[in-house]
């Protein structure tokens, strides 16, 4: 367990939270609608002032000078056009709306776009991963080279292993949570494998006898007897999987 915890500590993963950036009103680019509304508003104000001026000049100077008669017609026309532009800018583009209405309308899209929570960034892996406003649960699998498989009792294995076979008890096998690994029961330096190698060397050394047919029959019988006695049992007999 100490080695496993040490390997987990060696895995470098840095997690830090990042507060989401809320764009200010200065960073928001002016849209085309705002430009058109502002243009209509100032044009309407200018035309309205010119229309008022022409109307006043026509009514004042009309009595003495006859060439100011056109101002009485042009002044009201310019004034009506200017008022129309102002109404379009106010009603359609909302250029003169109240400040509280604007703030309430700006808060609704910001609350919809802004994630509701901090952001978590993982930087100790191949590619950084960022989670916005979500509950992050980190899971690191255990290392593969653990000293002992989980759920295997070494004293139980030592008590049931014998040179020519394995004696299992039903209660102990049922109590195990997971099947034992084959290499833990029969390692490479087991006596069964050593005897098998001795049998193979013995059969190789007996190939120089004068009668090959009789020697092959005897060697085959000896090899079958030795393998039947010292070879490890199959995995299905060691641990039967539940059906």
Curated annotation (Swiss-Prot):
Acetylation among keywords: no
Pfam families reported in the protein's UniProt record: TMEM174
Keywords: Cell membrane, Endoplasmic reticulum, Membrane, Transmembrane, Transmembrane helix
Any GO BP annotation: phosphate ion homeostasis
Superkingdom, taxonomy of origin: Eukaryota
Annotated signal sequence range: none
UniProt keyword annotation of Membrane present: yes
Location relative to the cell: Endoplasmic reticulum membrane; Apical cell membrane
First-listed, main subcellular location of the protein, grouped into a coarse class: endoplasmic reticulum
Transmembrane segments: 40-60, 73-93
Cysteines engaged in disulfide bonds, as pairs: none
Gene Ontology CC: one annotated term: apical plasma membrane
Tissue-wise expression: Predominantly expressed in kidney. Selectively localized in the apical membrane of renal proximal tubule epithelial cells.
Membrane topology: Multi-pass membrane protein
Function text: Regulator of plasma phosphate homeostasis. Decreases serum inorganic phosphate (Pi) uptake by regulating the sodium-phosphate cotransporter SLC34A1 trafficking by PTH and FGF23 in the kidney.
Subunit structure comment from the entry: Interacts with SLC34A1; regulates SLC34A1 internalization by PTH and FGF23.
Descriptive protein name: Transmembrane protein 174
Source species of the chain: Homo sapiens (Human)
Native organism taxonomy: Eukaryota, Metazoa, Chordata, Craniata, Vertebrata
